[in-house]
Design a protein with these regions (language model features):
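Residue position within the beta-strands of beta-propeller blades
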Residues: 104, 168-173
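Amphipathic beta-strand/beta-sheet edge segments enriched in Tyr/Trp
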Residues: 22, 85-152
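Predominantly a core beta-strand signature of beta-propeller blades
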Residues: 129-132, 192-196
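Bacterial N-terminal signal peptides
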Residues: 7-15
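Short loop/turn segments that connect beta-strands within beta-propeller blades
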Residues: 125, 188-192
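Short beta-strand->alpha-helix linker/helix-N-cap micro-motif
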Residues: 27-90, 103-108
Length: 205
């Protein structure tokens, strides 16, 4: 399997010591999903603009699938990514969207062609940064970085380890009923990055 080059280059997080810490209690029987706003990431210095939109979409889908989060509709957003970078976060306006947490990010293309991905998680009511990290990676690895960021957000807000940066190994079966071909395959937990590990010539139980 190809070696994955992923470098964590910076830890930006601070624990918010608010009167009531923003946290989902996963031990409760019935949980109301937490409203969370996940903005597009700001693309700087030649960074891929498509990725700046695709990464937040993957993060949003991951968190929503967990059943613990309810992403705010982007049409309700009160600031663009450019506005956040230039003016800072206008927390009072974000509170009007009912979002309890806010995710922002920045993509930068480095001189050696790699991509620097930075994200920050904010408590909208205390106006505090809850956590944040930056990663150096290849552009083609953007989807995995989105899963890693999803895990960081999930852990910070639930206290439990995330599972989004995990992969599923399974037996793929196809062909006519009398000549079925079984191959060992692997994919991300969300069904993307599917690859076959065997060619179907050998027996797979």
């Amino acid at each position: 399997m190809k070696h994955l080059y992923l470098t964590l280059i910076l830890f930006l997080g601070f624990t918010a010591h608010a009167h009531a810490e923003l946290r989902i209690d996963v031990t409760r029987g019935t949980i109301e999903p937490m409203p969370i706003a996940i903005t597009s990431f700001h693309a700087e210095q030649g960074a891929n603009g498509a990725i700046s939109n695709d990464m937040p979409q993957v993060i949003s889908e991951n968190l929503e699938r967990s059943g613990l989060f309810k992403p705010v509709n982007p049409r309700a957003f009160v600031q663009s990514t450019q506005s956040i970078v230039k003016e800072g976060i206008r927390f009072a306006e974000w509170r009007a969207t009912n979002a309890q947490a806010l995710v922002t990010g920045v993509l930068t293309r480095t001189n050696d062609g790699r991509t620097r991905v930075e994200f920050r998680l904010w408590d909208v009511f205390s106006e505090k940064q809850l956590t944040g990290m930056a990663y150096m990676t290849s552009e083609s690895n953007w989807r995995r970085i989105a899963h890693i960021i999803s895990d960081e957000i999930y852990k910070r807000l639930t206290g439990e380890d995330g599972y989004f940066d995990s992969r599923i190994v399974y037996v793929s079966e196809n062909g006519p009923p009398t000549a079925r071909v079984k191959r060992l395959a692997i994919m991300d937990q969300d069904g993307f990055n599917h690859k076959y590990l065997t060619d179907g010539k050998n027996l797979v139980l």
